[in-house]
Curated annotation (Swiss-Prot):
Origin species: Heliobacterium modesticaldum (strain ATCC 51547 / Ice1)
Name of the molecule in the record: Small ribosomal subunit protein uS5
Entry keyword set: Ribonucleoprotein, Ribosomal protein, RNA-binding, rRNA-binding
Subunit composition and interactions: Part of the 30S ribosomal subunit. Contacts proteins S4 and S8.
Gene Ontology annotations of biological process type: translation
GO terms, molecular function: rRNA binding; structural constituent of ribosome
Amino acid sequence: MARIDASGLELQEKVVYINRVAKVVKGGRRFSFSALVVVGDGKGHVGFGLGKAGEVPEAIRKGVEDAKKNLIVVPVVGTTIPHPALGVFGAGRVLLKPASKGTGVIAGGPVRAVLELAGIHDILTKSLGSNNANNMVRATMEGLRSLKRAEEVAKLRGKTVEEITG
């Protein structure tokens, strides 16, 4: 899959999680930080990145750089997704279900950040398994990556959209 050029997009960023880790050395503890960041344009492009550094702002900057390298295109139909999907990463599983207009984003913290920046306004989600922010963000991204529009499925099967939708 071709990499998406982030320079032409107006990306917003959201810090999902900041973690402080300690390395114990002879003189005491050395602290460093990792930041899980999600970026998106609200029009179907979204990505996530993990940045690690000795200071929080530097970790966030690195996370944003990484997120811009991992952008994906999400097929948005109106204000929701085309069909239900299950995203899995490690022990984290996230169920994504399309919702009617006016429902809003029914999702927990890390999942909500990804969906809002992807430009999805009506969706139902359920976190199954791990509640680790990293696993949930990655599982959500896998679920969004697995989505296909009816036109794409029809083309793959060599049929018309009417034949597939019934």
